[in-house]
């Protein structure tokens, strides 16, 4: 539980590009083992591969349908699948083995495979069946189908809570045990998850010091005015702390449903330095309303910390305007019509920020539109003077003549040569 690790920016960009461009634009599918560190209080959200929204994080359950003794929880977990474990009767997973003595046994098979590394390929196999039944599904369709077809295992487990959209979801199991039959049945008639919409709020820079060893939360609220039906949420935090394992970090949605991003655990490492947490707990909830990031230092010791900055990034399907269809709603897009001009500047320049055929003129390409530029053609003469002097203010080859250089153009000068 004392390792916080994530892929670098090139790897993240490669995963994202593959999700959007693989399979001729439908996107490649990534499944990822949630992790086997439960006995060390590890959490899948401390793994930047497993909490990436383009991957499907998979936890493990035993043959009783209960959390395997090693399977890490996390707000990023989408589904769970069977693997080894169980008490009082232990049962492993049977699979092929390395031939001969180098394997788990002298034979070519083993009945003791396990871990989330066993649960994850089971999910991959079900996804293959889903894609076989409907080859036109994109990467978001696959995730949506898993959310809506998985079954609620171990129903009496207290980790199950209903989110604001009516889904039962668990930090141990995600949306439940994968169900091949239900998933394929749903996939056969699946049409579309809708056009993706993304919106960010922040970064906010509170610079707030955290009280040490208290049971009360330090809260950072933000009101979201737009309506996106959520799929995933990313939370970027920059928190200075000399023992980050002391911190509880929770995101609360307008419905009151909570994503536990980090819980107190044995990790004396420093800081969450621009760390990206991921959560799927709010799937199908609306973004509209008050969101709260809650942080507390629950250990009384000499370690202290400060919340330097944080940011919320929403992904889903928006009931919002997106004029240029770039996936970012106009509310969050500095250039709504994608014409290369900032909306605020367009308004100042008396052009339409929602029409990419309506762009500010900038004759001299100085970055100031003609509407606001005193010298449209950049010839050194103010436009109003050029108009008075019968020269063209939009042509820098047309400049007022001033033979005697007295500052009055010949057109208006009663004595052009200044000879009295």
Q: What does each model-identified segment do?
A:
Residues 1-32, 39-59, 64-84, 138, ...:
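Mature extracellular/periplasmic domains of secretome proteins
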Residues 27-28, 54-55, 69, 132-217:
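C-terminal subdomain of the subtilisin-like protease fold in secreted/lumenal serine endopeptidases
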Residues 35, 169-171, 176-248, 306-320:
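Secreted peptidase-domain scaffold signal
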Residues 48-132, 136:
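Extracellular S/T/G-rich loop segment that most often corresponds to the catalytic His/Ser-adjacent loop
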Residues 58, 79, 117, 126, ...:
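Residue-level detector of buried hydrophobic side-chain packing
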Residues 294-303:
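Short beta-strand-plus-loop segments that form exposed binding edges in beta-rich domains
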Residues 319-420:
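Extracellular calcium-associated, cysteine-rich motifs in secreted modular proteins
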């Amino acid at each position: 539980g004392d390792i916080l690790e994530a892929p670098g920016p090139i790897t993240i960009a490669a995963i994202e590009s593959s999700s959007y461009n693989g399979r001729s634009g439908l996107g490649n599918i990534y499944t990822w083992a949630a992790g086997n560190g439960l006995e060390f209080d590890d959490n899948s959200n401390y793994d930047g591969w497993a909490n990436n929204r383009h991957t499907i994080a998979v936890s493990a359950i035993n043959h009783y349908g209960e959390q395997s003794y090693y399977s890490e929880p996390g707000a990023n977990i989408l589904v769970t699948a069977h693997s080894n474990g169980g008490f009082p009767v232990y049962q492993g997973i049977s699979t092929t083995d390395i031939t001969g003595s180098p394997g788990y046994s002298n034979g070519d098979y083993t009945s003791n495979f396990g871990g989330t590394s066993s649960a994850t390929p089971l999910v991959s196999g079900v996804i293959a069946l889903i894609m076989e039944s409907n080859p036109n599904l994109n990467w978001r369709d696959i995730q949506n189908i898993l959310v809506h077809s998985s079954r609620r295992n171990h129903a009496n487990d207290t980790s199950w809570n209903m989110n604001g959209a009516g889904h039962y979801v668990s930090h141990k199991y995600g949306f439940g045990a994968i169900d091949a039959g239900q998933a394929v049945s749903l996939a056969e008639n699946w049409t579309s998850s809708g056009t993706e919409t993304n919106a960010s709020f922040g970064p906010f820079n509170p610079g707030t010091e955290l009280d040490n060893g208290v049971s009360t939360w330090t809260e950072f609220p933000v009101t979201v005015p737009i309506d996106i039906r959520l799929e995933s949420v990313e939370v970027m935090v920059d928190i200075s702390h000399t023992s980050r394992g002391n911190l509880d970090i929770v995101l609360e949605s307008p419905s009151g449903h909570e994503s536990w991003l980090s819980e107190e655990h044995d990790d004396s490492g420093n800081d969450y330095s621009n760390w990206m947490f991921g959560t799927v707990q709010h799937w199908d909830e609306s973004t509209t309303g008050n969101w709260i990031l809650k942080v507390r230092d629950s250990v009384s010791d000499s370690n202290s910390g400060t919340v330097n900055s944080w940011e919320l990034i929403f992904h889903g399907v928006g009931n919002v305007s997106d004029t240029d269809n770039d996936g970012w709603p106009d509310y969050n897009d500095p250039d709504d019509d994608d014409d290369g001009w900032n909306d605020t500047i367009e308004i100042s320049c008396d052009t339409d920020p929602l029409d990419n055929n309506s762009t500010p003129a900038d004759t001299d390409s100085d970055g100031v539109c003609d509407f606001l530029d005193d010298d449209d053609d950049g010839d050194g003469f103010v436009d109003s003077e050029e108009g008075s002097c019968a020269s063209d203010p939009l042509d820098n080859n047309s400049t007022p003549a001033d033979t005697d250089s007295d500052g009055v153009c010949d057109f208006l000068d009663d004595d052009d040569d200044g000879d009295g």
